Amino acid sequence: MTVRQQWILVGVVVLVLAGGLFAGVNIFADDLYPVGVGSKAPNFKAKDLQSRAPKTLADYKGQVVLLNVWATWCEPCKAEMPSMEELYRSYQPHGLHILAVSIDDYVTEDSIRAYAKDLGLTFEILHDPTHAIEKAYQTTGYPESFVIDRDGVIRRKWIAAADWNAPGSRALFDELLGTRPPMNEGAGAVP
C-alpha cells in the first residue's frame, strides 16, 4: 500500500468515525441534553380531555405554563391538586395556564374526567397514555412539575407534591406574570 493510499484510508476511517459520532449524538440526544431548569421546554402532544382535541406546548407560546405530570393512582398527586387549583384561580386572570397531564394508561378518559370533577379542578386536564411526555421531559417521579416562562424556558422543576400557595411559589408566579402578590384582607398588608 502506498503512502497516498494509507492517507486516503486514514481519511475514510476519520469520516466514518465522525459520522458515527454525529449519528450517536442525534440518537442519544435526550441523554446528552437533560431537561432541567434553564433549558428549553420540549414540545409535546397530549389529548385535552375537555375538548377532546390534541394540545401541544406550542399552543401556549408566549404564555406562562405550569406543566404537571401526574396519575390518578398517585396519592401525592391528589394531595397537591387543591393548592394547584387555588393557584390557578388566583393567577388565571393574569395569564397562568396549568396543564395537568395524566399518564394513566389503564384508566379510561371518562374516569380521569370524573376524578378531576370530584376534585373540583377547572384547569386543563390532558391525557398521554403513551408516556411520551415522560420521555420528552425525562421525568423520574410523580407528581413532577415544570414552570415554563413566556420564552419557553423551564424556570423551576419540582419532583413530589408541592404547596403551590407557599410564598415562594406565589413569588415565582408574580415575577413571571408581572403581578403583585394578592392582598390578604385583614392581614395588615400595605399596597
Predicted features by range, described:
Residues 65-67, 99-101, 146:
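Conserved hydrophobic packing residues within short motifs/helices of P-loop NTPase cores
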